[in-house]
């Protein structure tokens, strides 16, 4: 089993458990250059809120879009947008990525901005 298939396997297992809970999910995806965050409805068919380093408004504030500072900016932005829509509680879906570095920075920034998970 290679690295990518192991990550997908972990993500599938976690998503199955989150689906059973029926909770709103904060989903994180990262690439070497960008990081993306989406708040997805409990049924899984609708993206309620999204933020990423691809967005011009966020990317203009950053020197580089693939580091922890960028992840923190995305976490803060997605939390603010979720709170505007009345979403306070979410379940954190790290998509099989290790809870470390950029993923952790995004989660910490979202918590500091007011999201609860």
From Swiss-Prot:
Transmembrane segments: none
InterPro entries named in the record: Ribosomal_uL18_bac-type, Ribosomal_uL18_bac/euk
Gene Ontology terms describing biological process: translation
UniProt keyword list: Ribonucleoprotein, Ribosomal protein, RNA-binding, rRNA-binding
Gene3D superfamilies: 3.30.420.100
Keyword RNA-binding: yes
MF annotations from Gene Ontology: 5S rRNA binding; structural constituent of ribosome
One GO CC term, this protein: cytosolic large ribosomal subunit
The keyword rRNA-binding appears for this protein: yes
Biological role stated in the UniProt entry: This is one of the proteins that bind and probably mediate the attachment of the 5S RNA into the large ribosomal subunit, where it forms part of the central protuberance.
Family under the similarity heading: Belongs to the universal ribosomal protein uL18 family.
Subunit organization: Part of the 50S ribosomal subunit; part of the 5S rRNA/L5/L18/L25 subcomplex. Contacts the 5S and 23S rRNAs.
Protein name from the UniProt record: Large ribosomal subunit protein uL18
Species, as recorded: Cronobacter sakazakii (strain ATCC BAA-894) (Enterobacter sakazakii)
Organismal lineage: Bacteria, Pseudomonadati, Pseudomonadota, Gammaproteobacteria, Enterobacterales
Gene: rplR
């Amino acid at each position: 089993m290679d690295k990518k298939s192991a990550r997908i396997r972990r993500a599938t297992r976690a998503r199955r458990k989150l689906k059973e809970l029926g909770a709103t999910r904060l989903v994180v995806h990262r690439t070497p250059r960008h990081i993306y965050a989406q708040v997805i409805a409990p049924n899984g068919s609708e993206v309620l809120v999204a933020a990423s380093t691809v967005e011009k408004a966020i990317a203009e504030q950053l020197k580089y879009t693939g580091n922890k500072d960028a992840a923190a900016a995305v976490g803060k932005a997605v939390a603010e947008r979720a709170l505007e829509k009345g979403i306070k509680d979410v379940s954190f879906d790290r998509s099989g990525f290790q809870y470390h570095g950029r993923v952790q920075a995004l989660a910490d920034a979202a918590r500091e901005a007011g999201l609860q998970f």
